[in-house]
Each structure stands twice: as C-alpha cells, then as structure tokens.
Amino acid sequence: MSVISMKQLLEAGVHFGHQTRRWNPKMAPYIFTERNGIYIIDLQKTVKKVEQAYNFIREVAAEGKDVIFVGTKKQAQEAIQEEAVRCDMHFVNNRWLGGMLTNFSTIKGRIRTLEELEQMEQDGTFEVLPKKEVIKLKLEEEKLEKNLGGIKNLNANNVGAMFVVDPRKEKNAISEAKILGIPVVAIVDTNCDPDEVDYVIPGNDDAIRAVKLITAKMADAVIEGRQGEQLAE
C-alpha cells in the first residue's frame, strides 16, 4: 500500500509543471512529456518520492525531532499553516526573516516581544493605555504574529527536517537549513533546481490542491512518527 496513489495526484493536478520555456534542465529525469507548451511531471516518480520523503519525515518525528513547514507563496500559506498546526509542528507562511534558524537568539527576542504584547492584551493593560498607543502596539503585535506566530515554541536546536513548497521562493530558508545541516524535503516544480533539496518531491507547486495534498501527507508522516515515539516510551 503506497503512501499516495496516482489517482490522488492526478485529481489534485500534481502532474502539471511549468511552461516549457521556464524550466530547469536538471528536472529532466522527472518529466514525463510535454503537452500544449507545459511539462507534464512523471507521477510514477512522484509516488516513489513522496514515499521516500514520508518515511524520512516519519523517522525524524519518531526520534522526537521537530519539522518546520515553510511556504510563503499565496497558494501555500493556508495549507502550510493548517497542516503544521494539525501535526503540532512549526511553520513560516508569511515571510522568512533572515536568521530565523541561524540567528535564532535574535529572533527569540522578537518572539518574547510578541508574547509580552499578547500578555498585555489579555491582562487588561491595553484598556488603561492611551488609545493611540494601543493602536500602535496592536499593529506591532499583528505584524509579529504574522511572521513569528508559527515558530513561537520552536527550539532551533531540535529541528530535524524542513519541508518547503517552492525552493526557488524559499531559497533563504533552504540556505539556512544547509548551514545547520538540516535536511530539506520540498515540492520541486519543473522550474526549480533539485540539487538544492535532499528529498525531492517532483510536483506542481502552484495549485492549491496539489500543495495541500502533499503537505498533508508530510503532516501524516509526523503524526505517525510521533505515535511511534509514544509507543516506544
């Protein structure tokens, strides 16, 4: 029983690559054919690659390590947040701030500011402050929540894998993962460089359904791995 079926991939449109003029020749092994100026991805390879990525993510989770989900393009934002929350992992879906992993102590300071602002809102401090100041503080809180809300509980030393939608868009995140020796799993479309990624999942990174399907599978792998970890205890 494979992790994902050809039918699921087809229905979600995972096989649609980019236009033929926008391609990376390194993706040639994953291309099945070309139709109407668009590359069609070889889904038999995608099935195998999803399985490899799934097994790897499951192992990472079973070892008690964390996975960080990264996807800041519009088509990925919702799936990245929903699936990371579902499997109780960390996510970045608005903007990758430089140093999120490599300079985590600075980022941790910003997270503390966010937590302090949340505390002020909850304990009624906002109610006694001048209105102008409250507006300013709320804007700051919203901005921090957007960028850091998904990594509030992150321990940067315990990240065992990074899952990425569109390595071209998330090159900063990937380069930080590389510096720290964190393996990268990614949905890689026909216009991306697969060499940047440790576990390549060839597929459409522009269709919401395609992104959701594969991201959900990675979240399933985390959940399965964590159950294994609990059983081992």
UniProtKB/Swiss-Prot annotation:
Statement: the UniProt record of this protein carries the keyword Ribonucleoprotein: yes
InterPro entries for this protein: Ribosomal_uS2 (IPR001865), Ribosomal_uS2_bac/mit/plastid (IPR005706), Ribosomal_uS2_CS (IPR018130), Ribosomal_uS2_flav_dom_sf (IPR023591)
SUPFAM superfamilies: Ribosomal protein S2
Listed GO CC annotations: cytosolic small ribosomal subunit
Keywords of the record: Ribonucleoprotein, Ribosomal protein
One GO-annotated biological process of the protein: translation
Example GO molecular function: structural constituent of ribosome
Superkingdom, taxonomy of origin: Bacteria
Record-stated family: Belongs to the universal ribosomal protein uS2 family.
Name of the protein in its database record: Small ribosomal subunit protein uS2
